[in-house]
């Protein structure tokens, strides 16, 4: 079978660390395994435009492997060219860069799987870290030291504690719930969550979280809001000018879910106006982020409030080990014809939705 693997280039960094599996040089650690079984592996980082390496190989690819960190956007146009495509594997978590509805509604017998759970702890830790970076005003403090400066007042005037704050998560699934667990030791005033379904009673009681069923009511109460929801038709552009106007003035917003959940220009304007005190995360749209993306340079009135990074929260070396192994397990199940996938990994099975996290579920 022909397998197309789309990853980022790591250059010298791949030689520095052999466990940097998620790059073109190290190929998820599966290149020799695939070769030994007689499969053809094409590995590339070139994924944009009709002349890209990805587009060159799509027509006869049996399997495409992609990641959320350097996503191969599997669009309607590309799917129409992919006459042999049987399986798409996301090495990581998040299949929003694949046109799942088009696969489902056109009857294409393509399965889409991801390595569920492979990086939930990694992302949850990053969320809490980003909250601390924003609330404690860490970035400009560190920049002072790098620039050989020392002006405590300039930092302290915009630095706060997490203790005593009301913190809300939009989404309380695998990542969102772990964020709530990790926030408990900080002694927040209250933990809130917004989700389409309530947590089990025992799970709510464990973290002391309260469900708020109206998102405008949720953000109006919160000092800190974190987005931990998948990207789909219902969440794309959810954090826009209108919803931001409902936030408590001077709130902090953290988004490690997907960049397109937020309207980039609206977030930047809210930060610059003071409606938001800070915004941080690691997800952008598109990815890699253009050099002129408004989130690169936005600041609050004190020249702070920006805690953006490249998309790496879910691709720590520990996470890469997990999603590389999970990808291999999915492929092995496919090659042997057992198709005994972990149920939580299946997004589409032969074109039919298995998960409730994505899709319209209205095949015509």
Swiss-Prot record:
Optimum pH is 7.5-8.5. Changing residue 145 to N: In strain: 2.2159. Changing residue 84 to K: In strain: 2.2159 and NCYC 1513. It is found in: Cytoplasm. Broad temperature optima between 45 and 55 degrees Celsius. Reaction rate increases steeply up to 55 degrees Celsius. 50% of activity lost after incubation for 20 minutes at 57 degrees Celsius. Thermal stability increases in the presence of glycerol. It is an enzyme of class 1 (oxidoreductase). Changing residue 197 to L: 4-fold decrease in substrate affinity for formate but no significant change in affinity for NAD compared to the wild-type. PANTHER family: FORMATE DEHYDROGENASE 1. Ideal catalyst for synthesizing chiral compounds of high enantiomeric purity from prochiral precursors due to a favorable thermodynamic equilibrium, the oxidation of formate to carbon dioxide while also reducing NAD to NADH. However, the necessesity for the presence of large quantities of the enzyme and its rapid inactivation under biotransformation conditions results in higher costs for the biocatalyst industry. In order to make this enzymatic reduction viable and to perform it on a larger scale a more efficient and cost effective process has been established. The lineage of its organism: Eukaryota, Fungi, Dikarya, Ascomycota, Saccharomycotina. This is Formate dehydrogenase. One of its GO terms (molecular function) is NAD+ binding. Substrate binds at residues 93, 119. The record marks 258, 311 as: Important for catalytic activity. NAD(+) binds at residues 174-175, 195, 230-234, 256, 282, 311-314. Belongs to the D-isomer specific 2-hydroxyacid dehydrogenase family. FDH subfamily. Changing residue 202 to D: In strain: 2.2159 and NCYC 1513.
């Amino acid at each position: 079978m022909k397998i197309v693997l789309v990853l980022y280039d790591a250059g010298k960094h791949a030689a520095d660390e052999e466990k940097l599996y998620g790059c073109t040089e190290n190929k998820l650690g599966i290149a020799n395994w695939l070769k030994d079984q007689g499969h053809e592996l094409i590995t590339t980082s070139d994924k944009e435009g009709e002349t890209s390496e990805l587009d060159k190989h799509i027509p006869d690819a049996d399997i495409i492997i992609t990641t959320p960190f350097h996503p191969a956007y599997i669009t309607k146009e590309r799917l129409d060219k992919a006459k042999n495509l049987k399986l798409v594997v996301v090495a990581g978590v998040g299949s929003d860069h694949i046109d799942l509805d088009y696969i489902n509604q056109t009857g294409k017998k393509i399965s889409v799987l991801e390595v569920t759970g492979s990086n939930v702890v990694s992302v949850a830790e990053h969320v809490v870290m980003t909250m601390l970076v924003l609330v404690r005003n860490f970035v400009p403090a560190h920049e002072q030291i790098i620039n050989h400066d020392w002006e405590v007042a300039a930092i302290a005037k915009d630095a706060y504690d997490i203790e005593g704050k009301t913190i809300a998560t939009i989404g309380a699934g695998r990542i969102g719930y772990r964020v709530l667990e990790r926030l408990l030791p900080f002694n927040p005033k209250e933990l809130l969550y917004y989700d389409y379904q309530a947590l089990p009673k025992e799970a709510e009681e464990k973290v002391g979280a309260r469900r708020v069923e109206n998102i405008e009511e949720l953000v109006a109460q919160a000092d800190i809001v974190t987005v931990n929801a998948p990207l789909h038709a219902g969440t794309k552009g959810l954090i826009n000018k209108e919803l931001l106007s409902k936030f408590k003035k001077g709130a902090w917003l953290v988004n490690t879910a997907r960049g397109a959940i937020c309207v980039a220009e609206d977030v930047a304007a809210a930060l610059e106006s003071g409606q938001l005190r800070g915004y941080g995360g690691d997800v952008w749209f598109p990815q890699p982020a253009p050099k002129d993306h408004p989130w690169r340079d936005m600041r609050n009135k004190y020249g702070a409030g920006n805690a953006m990074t490249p998309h790496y929260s879910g691709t720590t070396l520990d996470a890469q080990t997990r999603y590389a192994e999970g990808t291999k397990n999915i492929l092995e199940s496919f090659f042997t014809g057992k198709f005994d996938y972990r149920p939580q990994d299946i997004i589409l099975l032969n074109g039919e939705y298995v998960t409730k996290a994505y899709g319209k579920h209205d095949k015509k």
